[in-house]
UniProtKB/Swiss-Prot annotation:
Its main location: cytoplasm. It holds the Pfam family NapD. This is Chaperone NapD. PANTHER family: CHAPERONE NAPD (PTHR38603:SF1). HAMAP family: NapD. Keywords: Chaperone, Cytoplasm. It comes from the Bacteria. GO terms for biological process: negative regulation of protein transport. Belongs to the NapD family.
Length: 93
């Protein structure tokens, strides 16, 4: 088991957010690559015509998750980032 798994296993709570990321249609491939380079981030769907991604991010640390969300705004070609969903799963230990 690696360190990431140990940290996640011992986490007291887990946060999941859903984002809509709008980008320049000419830069979608680079935006997608940059998004997928962020740990615990996935792209369930993409509308290439509108230049919009549905992005799911997860973390056991809400501050780290906020940093990840803020970093998306700095990706070249990103126009707008909207938070559309947040869930916190608290573990009872």
């Amino acid at each position: 088991m690696n360190n990431t798994n140990l940290i996640l296993e011992n986490a007291r709570d887990w946060h999941v957010v859903g984002l809509i990321v709008q980008g320049n249609p000419k830069k979608l491939s680079a935006i997608q690559t940059a998004l997928l380079a962020i740990e615990h981030t996935e792209i369930p769907t993409l509308d290439e015509k509108l230049g919009k991604f549905v992005v799911v991010m997860q973390s056991n640390d809400q501050h780290l998750l906020l940093e990840k969300m803020e970093s998306v705004k700095d990706i070249d070609g990103v126009i707008n980032v909207s938070l559309v969903y947040h869930e916190q799963d608290e573990q009872n230990k």
